Amino acid sequence: MKKLIWSHLFAIVSILGIWYYHVKIDHLMVILLASVLSLEMGFIAYYSRNIFIRLLASLGLLFFYPQSLGIFLSLVSLEWSTKDIWQSNHFMQYMAYLLAILFIISSALLSLKLLVNAYDISKRYQLATVIPVMLFSSFAFCLEKSGSLGLEGIILNTSAFFNGIQTNMANLDFKALSCLFLVQLLLWGILMED
């Protein structure tokens, strides 16, 4: 219950910080909201007793979790120099951005942990369970960034989405995919193992 309260408080403070200080990072609010939804799906899967709702929440988590990886690309669009950060307005923008990064990474990991715990998977099989999720999210994120393909295309136009997958597979960067996977795996190993 503590995680539920603290994570929602963390989300509210992060969203208000980004909104109030007008942090100008591409798609930061969208990534932040996708992380909130991913975390909510994790909580629903964990606290629900109905297997159908748990399964729907798991599918929702698999939809929103790859969007959280966009925070790693937002680092590219930083506009602060070292001397500019220490000006009062820039410092608060930078701190709001750091708060958003911390929330997005921690909510992504916590949502995966909640998903694993929702299905009562023993500790020795947890890593084997999250590896396919991490591979899927890295693949989906790289596939989306290699072309004009978005995950929302599944809902809007399914046939065009699968044709777009074939087109984007030629441009897929497997080095980026493996790096994103390793970053997620290392963060899981460092932060989530008890």
Residue ranges and their predicted role:
Residues 57-66, 129-146:
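Hydrophobic alpha-helical membrane-insertion segments
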Residues 138-160:
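Juxtamembrane non-transmembrane "cap" segments at the membrane-aqueous interface
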Residues 26, 90-95, 159-186:
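Membrane-interface transmembrane-helix boundary segments in multi-pass integral membrane proteins
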Residues 44-56, 117-127:
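Membrane-interface helix-boundary motifs at transmembrane edges
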